[in-house]
Amino acid sequence: MIAYKFLRSGRTGTFSEFQWPEPGVWVQSSGDVAACRSGIHACRTTDLPWWLADELWEIELADEVRADEHKLVAPAGRLLARVDGWTPQCGREYAEACALRARDQTGEALVRAGHAGAARELAGCSTLDELLDASRKLAAEIPDAQISLTILGDGALQALAVASSATAYIAAHAAIRLNGPAAYRAERVWQSRWLCERLGLRADR
């Protein structure tokens, strides 16, 4: 089965710190396969937003592949090729796109709460710096929307730091605050589609 795997720089496991060999070399799990504990972990395209890191690789999984929440796990796997399109610049663009999505969701929440003027002020923000400044200012001015606006500001701040995973997480939680769990899932789907389209990945993996 072909899937994807995020690694830190130098083909290093994000959590395990395992040093992956050159592409094409098989790695076998030393114990029983158990999600988040042992085995070769990878993800489908729908799982990508949960696992962002420095490098994205195409990986082949062998033997029995188990699907778990937001991940795949198998007894064996080998890296095939790095996805060159996932670069720091791509990460910045993704983080900015997520932050602007959070802007729109927060603006909708403000309109519902009777703060249409504040929503228009947010809608006029076209850069992350503008969004950060506006969200902080409005959070101080509108006590009943302080939490949502603080979350929005945190998302803009994380995007400025190119913390794309954190920005995506914040955007998804802005969605759940607005419209519940279904909106959270929809936001994660949007994030996955953005990555697939930008990186040229097949959405069925």
Feature roles, as predicted:
Residues 1-205:
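Short, glycine-biased loop/turn motifs at secondary-structure junctions and
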